[in-house]
Amino acid sequence: MLAVAVLAAGKGTRMKSALPKVLQPLAGATLVERVLASARNLAPERRLLIVGHQAERVEAQLSSNGGLEFVLQQPQNGTGHAVQQLLAPLQGFQGELLVLNGDVPLLRAETIEALVSTHRSSQADVTLLTARLDDPTGYGRVFADANGRVSAIIEHRDCSDEQRSNNLTNAGIYCFNWGKLAEVLPQLSTDNDQGELYLTDTVQLLDVAMQMEVSDPDEVNGINNRRQLAQCEGVLQQRLRDHWMDEGVTFVDPASCTLSEDCSFGCDVVIEPQTHLRGACRIGDNCRLGPGSLLDNAELGCDVTVVQSVVRDARVGNDVAIGPFAHIRPATDVGDSCKIGNFVEIKKSVIAAGSKVNHLSYIGDAELGANVNVGAGTITANFDGTNKHLTVIGEGSKTGANSVLVAPVVIGKNVTIGAGSTITKAVPDGSLAIGRAKQLTKEGWDRNTQAAQS
């Protein structure tokens, strides 16, 4: 049996944030959510999150993470003290305990699985993950023989100069025999510079401790400040881009683009510079995104172009051109072969196949039929000051430039709206509707004379 415990009680003072450190976002998910996800494939019998600082906020964020048990550490007095809080909830548990840190979000699932497998095959009391760092400053040093058997872990601040020359470091990730660990946890001492209970001290209290060195030190990067958060974001983004380039996606300037792990792409997608995808974006074959575009939970069909535009929580069909400078807002559904042009905003609307909204328009709370042509400057006036109302435009209809459709209003099929019209009443199929003031022309108008007389 396996239990997984994640240490998530710390304040994260160096982040200088009102948000708990483990809830800081990284590529669309919080740090602690990424840590929990990395152990998902192990299918542990127990999953425990040790909380402390802003415990209620952390628990609220993770309340939908099924089967997660919350254990309070109050006050926070070191990693050993944190794991001591498991003595009661894991009383009688028989198996291994995997201890992860809530601020180490880059650990791969494969590495965790290998650590557990190594621990089980070695039959050690504890197996810890280690990394060789070019600059090990601040990390505890691991001292082990050629067979991987660990004799000691010494925190950086407690190391002598000679001991600090060792660059094999403790990653703070352990797989314990829980029964053996439970026996020695009460023996931990605060006799160190910090006056805290170190989990690392259990290594000297247990009979057999082994280490497994991680192949990529980036995996065990911890996050204590904004710089380290940015560095981890860069590592994770590079992983995501590398994965999708291997799957056939072209990034014209990879370093200028960001993704979330929930994105998916079809074949021959091209992503131009300064384009960002967030949330669960679904991008079909032969799409071209950017430059300078933002997509957030967007679903795009095949052969779609999005140039210098924003698409949020919306669906776009096949063979659609969007932009430049268009804003497709939530709950919008754009059908096949549509054109959404420059400086167009669409909100909570359905645009049926073949329709065009080419210039300078606002379409909100509307239903457009197939092959509608919306003239430049057309506005659906959907808000009466209290409620939003629906505009319906039937298939084949055309609105002239600078038209205002005051909702609620229904425009029938194959209707023509004259330029500059304000439409407040329903227009039947096949009609021409004009609703504008009569033009007044005064010939021989001398503006200077008129100004002097006024």
Curated annotation (Swiss-Prot):
Chain sites annotated for binding acetyl-CoA: 376, 419, 436
Active site positions, chain numbering: 359 (proton acceptor)
Pathway connected to this protein: Nucleotide-sugar biosynthesis; UDP-N-acetyl-alpha-D-glucosamine biosynthesis; N-acetyl-alpha-D-glucosamine 1-phosphate from alpha-D-glucosamine 6-phosphate (route II): step 2/2; Nucleotide-sugar biosynthesis; UDP-N-acetyl-alpha-D-glucosamine biosynthesis; UDP-N-acetyl-alpha-D-glucosamine from N-acetyl-alpha-D-glucosamine 1-phosphate: step 1/1; Bacterial outer membrane biogenesis; LPS lipid A biosynthesis
GO MF, one example: UDP-N-acetylglucosamine diphosphorylase activity
SUPFAM superfamilies reported in the protein's UniProt record: Nucleotide-diphospho-sugar transferases (SSF53448), Trimeric LpxA-like enzymes (SSF51161)
One Gene Ontology cellular component annotation held by this UniProt entry: membrane
Biological-process GO terms, alphabetical: cell morphogenesis; cell wall organization; lipid A biosynthetic process; peptidoglycan biosynthetic process; regulation of cell shape; UDP-N-acetylglucosamine biosynthetic process
EC nos: 2.7.7.23, 2.3.1.157
Family annotation (Pfam families): Hexapep, NTP_transf_3
UniProt region (Pyrophosphorylase), positions on chain: 1-226
Compartments where found: Cytoplasm
Region (N-acetyltransferase): 248-454
Chief localisation class: cytoplasm
Cofactor(s) demanded: Mg(2+)
Binding annotation for UDP-N-acetyl-alpha-D-glucosamine: 7-10, 21, 73, 78-79, 140, 155, 170, 224, 329, 347, 362, 373
Keywords attached to this entry: Acyltransferase, Cell shape, Cell wall biogenesis/degradation, Cytoplasm, Magnesium, Metal-binding, Multifunctional enzyme, Nucleotidyltransferase, Peptidoglycan synthesis, Repeat, Transferase
Chain spans, region Linker: 227-247
Binding site for Mg(2+): 103, 224
Functional note: Catalyzes the last two sequential reactions in the de novo biosynthetic pathway for UDP-N-acetylglucosamine (UDP-GlcNAc). The C-terminal domain catalyzes the transfer of acetyl group from acetyl coenzyme A to glucosamine-1-phosphate (GlcN-1-P) to produce N-acetylglucosamine-1-phosphate (GlcNAc-1-P), which is converted into UDP-GlcNAc by the transfer of uridine 5-monophosphate (from uridine 5-triphosphate), a reaction catalyzed by the N-terminal domain.
Family: In the N-terminal section; belongs to the N-acetylglucosamine-1-phosphate uridyltransferase family. In the C-terminal section; belongs to the transferase hexapeptide repeat family.
Subunit structure: Homotrimer.
PANTHER family in UniProt: BIFUNCTIONAL PROTEIN GLMU, NUCLEOTIDYL TRANSFERASE
Name of this chain's protein: Bifunctional protein GlmU
Organism name: Synechococcus sp. (strain CC9311)
Gene: glmU
